Design a protein with these regions (language model features):
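Short S/T/G/P-rich N-terminal loop/turn motif that feeds into the first structured element of a domain
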Residues: 1-50, 57-208
């Protein structure tokens, strides 16, 4: 399974318009494309950062959709009042585990990291055996995912929790897990963000 993420930064005051556009126009169009297995959208209402991720059954389906998705992305940038500092990345969905569906008010903690590309499988095994069992024990746990780029060693891990209170409750626990990942897995943590999960239409099967 594969995923394409689009990260933009725009005017926080236009965020509701951007959410409505993705919900009412982008998602209906994307879900009819061959191989699409879902779409999610996360937002930081303070900074205006917004991440839209589409999921695909295989690499071929993801790449075949690129030309049709491009004008929607351009329209989203214009509608959101975003600058041209957008980032589009393609990922392998390495880990996906659900505890229960995310409801209204769900939030996500997103961690970007980089490791040795040559040790990708070893790092994934460490994540599954060492970190995942403790992540799913966090209060309010809904789901977690790990997307990887095997070529450059980048990864993005997302933990979805029931609400903002649970984000605050687990902040220290998450910090300790990141430190353990740095120590045991030898990864570099590039960025961490706490965001609202505003759309979650995912039919991606679990990998755990």
């Amino acid at each position: 399974m594969y995923a394409r993420s689009t990260t933009i930064r725009g005017n926080p005051g236009s965020l509701d318009d951007a959410i409505a556009y993705v919900r009412d126009e982008v998602w209906p169009a994307v879900q009819d494309m061959d191989g699409c297995t879902g779409l999610s959208m996360m937002c930081d209402r303070e900074t205006g950062r917004c991440i839209v991720t589409s999921a695909w059954a295989d690499r071929e389906a993801m790449q075949a959709s690129a030309e049709r998705v491009h004008p929607m992305r351009r329209h989203l940038v214009d509608r959101f009042g975003a600058d041209d500092d957008l980032e589009v990345r393609e990922w392998e969905v390495a880990v996906l585990h659900r505890g229960h569906p995310a409801g209204d008010g769900a939030c996500a903690r997103v961690t970007w990291s980089r490791g040795d590309p040559g040790r990708a499988d070893q790092l994934l095994d460490m994540y599954r055996t060492s970190l995942l069992p403790r992540i799913q024990e966090m209060p309010g746990f809904c789901s977690c995912s790990l997307l990887i780029d095997r070529e450059d060693g980048r990864a993005v891990g997302t933990v979805v929790l029931d609400g903002r209170d649970h984000l605050e409750q687990t902040r220290e626990q998450a910090r300790l897990l990141r430190e353990e990942g740095v120590r045991i897995m030898g990864i570099d943590v590039l960025d961490v963000a706490e965001m609202d999960l505003v759309l979650a239409h995912l039919r991606v099967p679990e990998t755990v």
